[in-house]
Swiss-Prot record:
Residues 1-54 form the ClpX-type ZB domain. GO terms for biological process: cell division; proteolysis involved in protein catabolic process. It comes from Parafrankia sp. (strain EAN1pec). ATP binds at residues 123-130. This is ATP-dependent Clp protease ATP-binding subunit ClpX. NCBIfam families: clpX, PRK05342.1.
Length: 430
């Protein structure tokens, strides 16, 4: 036990040697003591190490081609969107590595690199959210998804825009430095378009008001974020986060924007010679390739908001072939997922080609895109997933077109039949 003095009644810190009279607090442990000054020093060392570990580090920043190839493993089709996103993300994080918007040397004549956020257009269920999620997974950065429809101006019922940043901080385990290099995907942004092209004299708290509130965080600012939500806990301490290096990807279906584009480029949208598009017509989404900022202005987005989204790309409607590829090709394809589920019960699951075609046709018919494929698969496989765990005699289940369309029971192959069929094949191959 560390003691000083003739009487041995004064205790001292086991680390720095100061007596209990020289420090504010001395904390006892099993045979040792530590003072408040040493505790503060330890905290400073830990904080420095944590801040260094939370900095964005890559041995080498992935090149646009590498990013594209990674996206290709998870997202089917949408080549133009993947190419645009690959270049935009590479340039963004190259800028972050170079030192941010000012780079620390802007005053010495260095070129200032501005941030370029991304606007992603296209119908629902075509991969907008998946593209953003896959990018964040590859780069190993914090990722948050926000729904623009829940946002309102400060002071009105709904979520404040600062809650978007809170989700990102939570995704980074409250490591603010790490969150400052994350990606935020704001979905359904078309729902915050103002109600008319012309500015209104009445207050639009969930439309134009939200666009105005988003301007600063999109551009880059130091925002004050309430860690528990600002409205329920008004007296809490705020977290300061700099959004200069946060990449914002803003997405929406923008239903009706195709007609605005067509009227500008000269295609008739009214009358006997009008170009008619159904909800699932591929041309209705392909026309987004001709978009101009003035089209978004007519749709109801304010000029300042459009100006902070300089990169515009779009995803197109998925046809039957693309949906079949989504079912089978990606690393986490639905067919592979369900095959794995059945393997855990010792059963092989097979889909015929016409069954996959029928599932794709159902998704097109429902207008849900790739997002609706899982719901259809659950409906098709419900009865067999109910029976299989209780049956030990089944080796294989075969899903045919009739199972999908007519809801008949799938073909179940018993284990003895499967073994007898497997035997001759093995003898032949041997």
């Amino acid at each position: 036990m560390a003691r000083i003095g003739d009487g041995g009644d004064l205790l001292k810190c086991s680390f720095c040697g100061k007596s209990q009279k020289q420090v504010k607090k001395l904390i006892a442990g099993p045979g040792v003591y530590i003072c408040d000054e040493c505790i503060d020093l330890c905290n400073e060392i830990i904080e420095e190490e944590l801040s260094e570990s939370s900095e964005l580090k890559w041995e080498e920043l992935p090149k646009p081609r590498e990013i594209y190839e990674f996206l290709d493993g998870y997202v089917v089709g949408q080549e133009a969107a993947k190419k645009t996103l690959s270049v935009a993300v590479y340039n963004h994080y190259k800028r972050v590595q170079a030192g941010g918007a000012s780079g620390g040397d802007a005053g010495k004549g260095e070129v200032e690199l501005a941030k370029s956020n991304i606007l992603l257009l296209g119908p629902t269920g075509c991969g907008k959210t998946l593209l953003a999620q896959t990018l964040a997974r590859m780069l190993n950065v914090p990722f948050a998804i926000a729904d623009a429809t829940a946002l309102t101006e400060a002071g009105y019922v709904g979520e404040d825009v600062e809650n978007i940043l809170l989700k990102l901080i939570q995704a980074a385990d409250y490591d603010v430095k790490k969150a400052e290099t994350g990606i935020i995907y704001i979905d359904e942004v078309d729902k915050i378009a103002r109600k008319s092209e012309n500015p209104s004299i009445t207050r639009d708290v969930s439309g134009e008001g939200v666009q105005q509130a988003l301007l600063k965080i999109l551009e880059g600012t130091t925002a004050s974020v309430p860690p528990q939500g600002g409205r329920k806990h008004p007296h809490q301490e705020f977290i300061q986060i700099d959004t200069t290096n946060v990449l914002f990807i803003v997405g929406g279906a923008f239903a009706g924007l195709d007609r605005i584009i067509e009227s500008r480029i000269g295609k008739k949208s009214l009358g006997f010679r009008a170009v008619l598009h159904g909800k699932d017509d591929p041309d209705a989404s392909n026309v987004f390739g001709d978009i101009m900022p003035e089209d978004l202005l007519k749709y109801g987005m304010i000029p300042e908001f459009i100006g902070r989204l300089p990169i515009i790309t779009s995803v197109s409607n998925l046809d039957r072939e693309a949906l079949i590829r989504i079912l089978t090709e990606p690393k986490n394809a639905l067919v592979r997922q369900y095959k794995r589920l059945f393997e855990l019960d010792g059963v092989d699951l097979d889909f015929t080609t016409d069954a996959l075609e029928a599932i794709a046709d159902q998704a097109i018919l429902r207008g849900t895109g790739a997002r609706g494929l899982r719901a259809i698969m659950e409906e098709v496989l419900l009865s067999v997933m109910y029976d299989i765990p209780s049956r030990k005699d089944v080796a294989r289940a075969v899903i045919t077109r009739e199972v999908v369309l007519e809801h008949v029971n799938p073909t179940l192959v018993p284990r003895d039949v499967a073994a007898s069929k497997r035997g001759p094949r093995q003898e032949k191959s041997a």
